[in-house]
Amino acid sequence: MRKLIIPLVIVGAYFLMQSSCEQNNQNIPYVPVNFDINLNLPSYTSLNFPGEHLIVQGGSKGIIIYRYTMDEFVVLDRHSTFDVTLGCHVAVESDGITLSDESECSDSKWIILDGSV
């Protein structure tokens, strides 16, 4: 009898653990991005100066291009990672260096340069 109880407990525990797991994969959609920008074109002139940003179409919800230095750019997708199912997007605050997602999501704010909060 004891030999029968132990395997039943193990099998029961296994099914109990499996039923408690949620299959809630919240991944940002994979969207390949491949484009070039010509800084001599009028639509990209704001990127000729460090500290400036530009929002362009592409990616999942758009792309933010930020000119960090004369030689470095930071490029981010605008899709908020808080709750992907809500479809919120990231915006650049008026100071030009802080990013935030919509208040309906998490109203989080972070620095565009390194992602620190």
What role is predicted for each listed range?
Residues E104-C105:
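Multi-pass alpha-helical transporter architecture, strongest
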Residues E22-G96, S108-S116:
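N-terminal pre-ligand scaffold of iron-sulfur
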Residues M1-C21:
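Sec-dependent bacterial lipoprotein signal peptides
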